[in-house]
Swiss-Prot record:
Catalytic function, reaction form: N(2)-formyl-N(1)-(5-phospho-beta-D-ribosyl)glycinamide + L-glutamine + ATP + H2O = 2-formamido-N(1)-(5-O-phospho-beta-D-ribosyl)acetamidine + L-glutamate + ADP + phosphate + H(+); L-glutamine + H2O = L-glutamate + NH4(+)
Name of the gene: purQ
Pathway: Purine metabolism; IMP biosynthesis via de novo pathway; 5-amino-1-(5-phospho-D-ribosyl)imidazole from N(2)-formyl-N(1)-(5-phospho-D-ribosyl)glycinamide: step 1/2
Protein EC: 6.3.5.3, 3.5.1.2
Subunit structure: Part of the FGAM synthase complex composed of 1 PurL, 1 PurQ and 2 PurS subunits.
Superkingdom, natural source: Bacteria
UniProt protein name: Phosphoribosylformylglycinamidine synthase subunit PurQ
Classification via PROSITE patterns: GATASE_TYPE_1
Length: 213
């Protein structure tokens, strides 16, 4: 039986279809969920990229106060896997499920390009299919992706070169319990060679490995 996964769709989400497709071709049974839905039936919850509520106030700030946020927090407490990609990462930060802050890129510009990353930690549900120290290539697309380290964090991914001014070139972090992962790069956009590369596939393969252990 395929693990059930869901993609939370906010007003302004624009990577929900990419996330759904990545799940579908990597062994999951995906569903879209809305802001009034329950999350009890899912083993993996993805908060996708985009511009939820137009990034008003701050990116992710309004979405973090939606009704679905209670369901996400409850799922996190129960140990379910949650992955926030780009705007989804911003939402998890705003909810307090991940440490730190995400501010405007140091360049003041929106950055959209493929970047090189280093897998700093492969002992996670999201990266166990990688080798520690493995160099991978995944695209980014954000204007507010500069990670500010407020406390000690479990760094999972790091940019090889500084791309947005993030502290210590941090690209992705994990919560203390190990079940909530936030990252600015888009693994769902790197699952097929046809569209530029498939290093992102290993993220979904890692989750599958973990759920089927």
């Amino acid at each position: 039986m395929k693990p059930r996964a869901c993609v939370v769709v906010y007003p302004g989400s624009n990577c929900d279809r990419d996330a759904y497709h990545a799940l579908e071709i990597n062994g999951f049974e995906p569903s879209y969920v809305g802001l009034d839905d329950k999350l009890d039936d899912y083993e993996l919850i993805i908060l996708p990229g985009g511009f939820s509520y137009g990034d008003y106030l701050r990116p992710g700030a309004v979405a973090a106060r939606e009704k679905i946020a209670f369901e996400i927090a409850k799922a996190a407490e129960r140990g379910k896997l949650i992955m926030g990609i780009c705007n989804g990462f911003q939402i998890l930060i705003e909810m307090g499920l991940l440490k730190g802050a995400l501010l405007q890129n140091s360049s003041g510009k929106f950055i959209c390009k493929w970047v090189d990353l280093i897998v700093e930690n492969n002992d996670t549900p999201f990266t166990n299919a990688f080798e520690k120290g493995e160099k991978i290539r995944i695209p980014i697309a954000h204007g507010f992706g500069r990670y500010v380290k407020i406390d000690d964090v479990n760094v999972v991914l790091r940019y090889v070169k500084d791309v947005n001014g993030s502290d210590e070139r941090i690209a992705g972090v994990l919560n203390e319990s190990g079940n909530v992962f936030g990252l600015m790069p888009h693994p769902e956009r790197a699952v097929e060679e046809l569209i530029g590369g498939e290093d992102g596939k290993k993220v979904f393969q890692s989750i599958l490995n973990y759920l089927k252990r």
